[in-house]
């Protein structure tokens, strides 16, 4: 809520988070939506009359929190914004789609992906959209284990491995802040699983389970009509370079994204449209879902 809305008053930001929690809304999404509304207001796409008298300028903490309430109660422009920035942009129009910061309809979390190429791929292929909890691939960029400004084929395998591990951590209901303490990590996770359930489990079996979950999620998205075209990034991330700072000039080109998508699909054993083939489904015990991908990869 702070940077997205230009609000530097910590009390206003804390109040906004409290409101979101109390009113049953995600604080990340609501911060992006309010920031989107502020940009619409400053560009003349939303009027003061539509806001119910609120002056939605960037930096206006009181207006930010008042709008959060309106969104929860679907009052004035809040009725449109309550649908999220993707649908709101479709309704507001006027080019607002270009600054609606979402992936697959889910508002982006707080990472500047224009200067984090591994993270950019992780977000693009995320089954939920703009959710850092599906991959955590920004860690490679931030730790300097890769050149964060460079798109390379090897990023595909990195993101795949992160996703599969996160599937296991979610299945264990383990906080991902502990992801670095598990030895192996699958060796220790498999040992814990066996000790708790009494069911023998090897590290390889545990790893394969994570892969199975990732592939099943992909199948469900394909069933719902998602394609390679949905594995993309917000317009701003791909067309507007970072204006200042150490990452000045960075953004993700379509060619860079395509290179990393191809590498990711290849690492997954999918075809170039991101569709798992029958051989992969058989390997993972998912042939019951073969009808979803008929005509896809072999």
Question: Residue locations for each model-derived region?
Answer:
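Extended C-terminal regions of large enzymes
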Residues: 1-298
């Amino acid at each position: 809520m702070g940077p997205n809305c230009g609000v530097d008053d910590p009390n206003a930001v804390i109040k906004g988070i409290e409101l979101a929690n109390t009113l049953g809304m995600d604080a990340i999404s609501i911060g992006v939506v309010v920031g989107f509304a502020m940009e619409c207001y400053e560009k003349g796409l939303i009027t003061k009359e539509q806001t119910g008298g609120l002056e939605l300028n960037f930096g206006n903490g009181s207006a930010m929190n008042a709008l959060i309430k309106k969104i929860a109660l679907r009052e004035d422009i809040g009725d449109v914004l309550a649908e999220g920035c993707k649908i709101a942009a479709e309704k507001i129009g006027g080019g607002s789609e270009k600054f609606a910061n979402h992936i697959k309809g889910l508002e982006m979390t707080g990472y500047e992906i224009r200067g984090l190429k591994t993270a950019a791929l992780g977000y693009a292929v995320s089954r939920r959209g703009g959710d850092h909890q599906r991959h955590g691939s920004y860690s490679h960029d931030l730790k300097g284990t890769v050149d964060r400004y460079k798109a390379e084929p090897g990023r595909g395998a990195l993101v795949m491995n992160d996703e599969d591990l996160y599937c296991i951590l979610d299945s264990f209901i383990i906080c991902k802040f502990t992801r670095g303490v598990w030895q192996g990590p699958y060796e220790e996770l498999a040992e814990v699983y066996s000790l708790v359930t009494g069911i023998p489990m090897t590290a390889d079996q545990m790893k394969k389970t994570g892969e199975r979950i990732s592939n099943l999620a992909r199948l469900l998205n394909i069933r719902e009509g998602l394609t390679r075209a949905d594995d993309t990034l917000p317009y701003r991330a791909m067309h507007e370079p970072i204006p200042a700072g150490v990452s000045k000039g960075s953004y993700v080109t379509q060619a860079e994204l395509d290179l990393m998508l191809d590498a990711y699909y290849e690492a997954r054993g999918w075809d170039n449209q991101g569709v798992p083939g029958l051989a992969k489904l058989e390997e993972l015990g998912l042939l019951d879902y073969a009808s979803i991908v008929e005509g896809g990869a072999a």
